[in-house]
Design a protein with these regions (language model features):
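N-terminal leader/targeting segments and the immediate start of mature chains
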Residues: 2, 18, 22-80, 222, ...
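An acidic-aromatic
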Residues: 71-144, 202-210
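Short, cysteine-centered beta-strand-loop-beta hairpins and adjacent loop/turn segments enriched
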Residues: 60-66, 89-96, 174-181
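A short, amphipathic edge element
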Residues: 32-36, 65-68, 144-155, 209
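Gly/Pro-enriched, hydrophobic low-complexity segments
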Residues: 157, 162-230
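Short, hydrophobic/aromatic-rich segments at coil-to-beta transitions
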Residues: 46-56, 78-83, 162-170, 192-198
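Sec-dependent N-terminal signal peptides
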Residues: 10-20
Length: 234
């Protein structure tokens, strides 16, 4: 296994920061995980229990100019979430070509995040070096998974997205103490009311997640487990 330098780890931190915006950890630190995919975020998908999709994810500044952009492979199964990205394909001024070269050399450009509320952890997996990290979920997120959350939607209007008639909603996810996540979603009636697009505020920025190549099929359950041959990263 290759020894990872601090420089090689920096883009990984950037990835985690990006995901922290995508699940609105800034809004709800009590329910956030280090990779930010949490029970409140999963609640946005409503009754859709299993699916796979590609996700075009953007971070926009207050002037709606793109700061970061990357594609994700996204899958859910029985409350579990799997996200896979390749940092070498991410567009960001904070990731120059020299950093991409370091990532490829270290074998850490490909990252898989496995949100496992049933095990009360998120696994961050690095297939290139056959290693993984274990990140415990916050107590509040465990409570949300066990006790459930309430989703409230307010219609803002109707728009067409990718040829699908969508209702644009303001969505608030609440636990017993109040709101834990707020978002704007575009839900397609002909796709089981699936949110084809999700926007959330991350401090002064906006995170936009646009879902494409959507398939309502059950992914292979083994995709949500760390391969047995992989070692725990020290």
């Amino acid at each position: 296994m290759k020894i990872l330098t601090l420089k090689a780890r920096i883009p990984v931190a950037l990835f985690l920061i990006l995901l922290s915006g995508s699940a609105a950890v800034a809004q709800a630190p009590s329910t956030g995980t280090p990779t930010a995919i949490n029970t409140a975020f999963v609640k946005l998908f409503g009754a859709v229990g299993s699916f796979t999709a590609k996700v075009d994810t953007q971070v926009l500044d207050p002037y709606q100019k793109e700061v970061v952009r990357l594609l994700m492979d996204f899958a859910t199964f029985e409350g579990k979430v799997r996200i896979e990205i390749n940092l070498a394909q991410m567009q960001s001024k904070d990731l120059p070509p020299s950093k991409i070269a370091e990532l490829k050399e270290s074998g850490m450009e490909r990252i898989i995040s496995l949100f496992r509320p049933d095990k009360k952890v998120t696994y961050v997996v690095y297939p290139g070096i056959q290693s993984y990290q274990t990140l415990p979920l916050a107590k509040a997120d465990n409570d949300a998974f066990e006790k459930g959350l309430k989703l409230e939607k307010t219609a803002l209007g109707k728009e067409t997205l990718d040829g699908h008639d969508c209702v644009k909603y303001k969505v608030v996810v609440k636990d017993t103490n109040g709101p834990v996540l707020q978002a704007v979603t575009w839900n397609a009636a002909d796709l089981k009311d699936f949110p084809l697009q999700i926007e959330m505020k991350e401090k002064i920025n906006t995170v936009r997640m646009h879902f494409t190549q959507l398939r309502f099929t059950k992914p292979d359950p083994q995709q949500f487990d760390v391969p047995a041959a992989y070692g725990l990263m020290k």
